[in-house]
Regions:
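Proteins enriched for Cys/Gly/acidic motifs involved in redox and nucleic-acid/cofactor modification
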Residues: 1-195, 234, 249, 271-279, ...
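Conserved SAM/AdoMet-binding glycine-rich loop
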Residues: 78-84, 89, 94, 179-305, ...
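Short acidic/polar active-site loop segments enriched in Thr and Asp
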Residues: 102, 183, 219, 318, ...
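Short strand-connecting beta-turns/loops that link adjacent beta-strands
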Residues: 147, 244, 256, 380-382, ...
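Conserved, mostly hydrophobic/aromatic
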Residues: 170, 187, 223, 251, ...
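Active-site proximal loops enriched in glycine and acidic residues that flank catalytic Cys/His/Asp
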Residues: 189, 225, 253-255, 291-295, ...
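Terminal RNA-binding accessory module
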Residues: 333-433
Length: 433
C-alpha cells in the first residue's frame, strides 16, 4: 500500500473516463500520485467511478466496490470512495447497504472529494487532464445530460437535462489538448446533434466541429452519439468538406418498425430514418456509419423483428452494435409496459441480428484489400503494430495489424498503409514506402 497514491477505477462509458481524467489531474495538482489500473491497485486510497446505465453495468459496479471493500478489510486500503452514475442515482441505498465505503459522491459533486481530503479544488486549465488514453487521442465531452426521454433509457434520470458546454470553452480544451500532443479527438455526449439547443435554442454542433477542424494540430475529429430526429443536415457538409473530420458517424437508430419507434418514444418514423441514411450517404460518399439497435423491447412482435432484419440487411452499416432490452427502474417503459418478450427470444433475436451484420461487416472490410489508407499507430502488441483508419474508433471498431518485422513504427504517428488481407475482426496491412 503506497502512501499518497490514489487508484482510480472507471466503469462504463468514455464520458465517465473524462470525469476520471479530470479528477486525477486535480489530485496530482494536490500532491497525490494517481494510477488507473484496476487490476493492480496499490494505493492507500481508491476511487471507483461507477456506471448505472443498465442492469449489467450496475452489477459490474457493485462487484467492483465489493472487491475493494475486501481489500480494505484485509488492510490493503485505507480509504474507499465511490462516485459516478450509480451513486448519483442510488446514493441513499448504497450508503445503507455498503457502510464500509467512506463516502459516496454523485455524478456532479465529485470535486467535493478534494475538500473532504483537505485539498483544494484547482481549476483545470483549458481542459488539461491526466490522459488515460494513448497520448495521441482524447475524448472531448461537449455536454452532459439528455432531453430526449426515450422510453427505455435511464440516462435523463441520472444526469438530468441536456447541458451544453459553451463553444469557446470546448475549443479552449481542444487547444490545450493539442498542446499536450493530442492529434485525434473523439467528440462525445449523450445526444451530440442537440448540442447548443439548450444555450440559445439553436443547433451549434456544425459551428463547433467546423471551428474545431480549423485548429492547427487537430488531425482527426470523430463524432459519436448522434440522434436521427432533427438531425442538422449542414453537419454533413462539414464532414464532407473538412479533411480532418473523419468520414464516420455514430448514430443510434435503435429500431426501424414504426410500431417499435413509437413505443420507444423515438420521435422519428421508418421513412424519416431511411431518408436520413440515404441523405448521409449521398452527401458524404464513403462515410462509415456505426449504429446501435435494440431487440426485445416490450411489444416487439415477430413482424417487427423481421422488419428490423430487413433493415440491417439493406442498410449495410459498416459498424453495428445491438443489445437486448432490460427493464430499467423509473423509465417510461418500466412504468407503462410489461416486459413481455421472453429472455430466450431476446437472445435468439440478438444472435440472429448480429449474424446478419457480421456477414455484412466481413464483406465490406474485404473490399478494403488492395487499397491504401492513412493509419494512426496506437500500440505495439507482440509481433504487430496496431493502428486504425479514420473509419475506426478506439476500442469498438476493427484495427489494422502491421507486422513489426517490416520496419520500426512510432506510436501516435500516421502512416500510409496498404491493406493486404482481412479477417472476421481486423485488417492486415503493410506500410507504403
Amino acid at each position: 500500500m503506497k502512501k499518497n497514491q490514489i487508484d482510480i477505477v472507471t466503469m462504463g462509458c468514455s464520458k465517465n473516463l473524462v470525469d476520471s481524467e479530470l479528477i486525477m489531474k486535480q489530485f496530482e495538482e494536490n500532491g497525490f500520485h494517481c494510477t488507473h489500473d484496476a487490476k493492480r491497485p496499490q494505493g492507500e486510497i481508491a476511487v471507483i467511478n461507477t456506471c448505472g446505465f443498465i442492469e449489467a453495468a450496475k452489477e459490474e459496479s457493485i462487484n467492483t466496490i465489493l472487491e475493494f471493500i475486501n481489500r480494505k478489510k484485509n488492510g490493503q486500503l485505507n480509504k474507499l470512495y465511490v462516485m459516478g452514475c450509480l451513486s448519483q442515482r442510488y446514493k441513499d441505498e448504497l450508503e445503507a447497504e455498503l457502510p464500509e465505503v467512506d463516502k459516496f459522491y454523485g455524478k456532479f459533486n465529485y470535486k467535493q472529494l478534494l475538500t473532504d481530503l483537505g485539498k483544494a479544488d484547482v481549476p483545470a486549465c483549458n481542459g488539461v487532464r491526466h490522459l488515460t488514453t494513448p497520448r495521441h487521442y482524447a475524448y472531448v465531452k461537449i455536454a452532459e445530460g439528455c432531453d430526449r426521454h426515450c422510453a427505455y433509457c435511464a440516462i435523463p434520470l441520472i444526469t438530468g437535462r441536456h447541458h451544453s458546454r459553451p463553444v469557446e470553452e470546448v475549443l479552449d480544451e481542444v487547444r490545450g489538448l493539442v498542446a499536450q500532443g493530442v492529434k485525434e479527438f473523439q467528440i462525445i455526449e449523450q445526444e451530440l446533434t442537440y448540442y447548443g439547443v439548450d444555450l440559445d435554442g439553436k443547433h451549434h454542433i456544425t459551428e463547433l466541429i467546423s471551428r474545431m477542424a480549423d485548429i492547427e494540430g487537430v488531425e482527426w475529429i470523430r463524432l459519436h452519439y448522434a440522434y436521427p430526429n432533427q438531425f442538422p443536415l449542414d453537419l454533413l457538409d462539414v464532414i464532407a468538406e473538412k479533411p480532418n473530420v473523419c468520414k464516420y458517424l455514430d448514430i443510434a437508430f435503435q429500431h426501424i418498425s414504426d410500431h417499435m419507434l413509437d413505443r420507444m418514444r423515438r420521435h422519428v418514423s421508418k421513412q424519416e430514418t431511411l431518408d436520413l441514411i440515404a441523405e448521409i450517404r449521398r452527401r458524404v460518399p464513403g462515410i462509415h456509419l456505426r449504429t446501435t439497435l435494440l431487440v426485445g423491447f416490450p411489444g416487439e412482435t415477430d413482424e417487427d423483428f423481421e422488419e428490423l432484419k430487413e433493415f440491417v440487411a439493406e442498410a449495410r452499416f459498416e459498424r453495428m452494435g445491438a443489445f437486448s432490452y432490460s427493464e430499467e427502474e423509473g423509465t417510461y417503459s418500466a412504468k407503462h409496459y410489461k416486459d413481455d418478450v421472453p429472455e430466450d427470444v431476446k437472445q435468439a433475436r440478438l444472435d440472429e441480428l448480429m449474424a446478419i451484420q457480421q456477414g455484412i461487416s466481413e464483406e465490406l472490410e474485404a473490399k478494403k484489400v488492395g487499397k491504401t489508407f492513412k493509419v494512426i499507430i496506437d500500440r505495439k502488441e507482440g509481433e504487430y503494430y496496431i493502428g486504425r483508419t479514420e473509419f475506426c474508433s478506439p476500442e469498438v471498431d476493427p484495427e489494422v495489424l502491421i507486422s513489426s518485422a517490416e520496419k520500426s513504427l512510432r506510436v501516435g504517428k500516421f502512416y500510409d498503409v496498404c491493406i493486404t488481407d482481412s479477417d472476421e475482426f481486423d485488417l492486415f496491412g503493410e506500410v507504403v514506402q
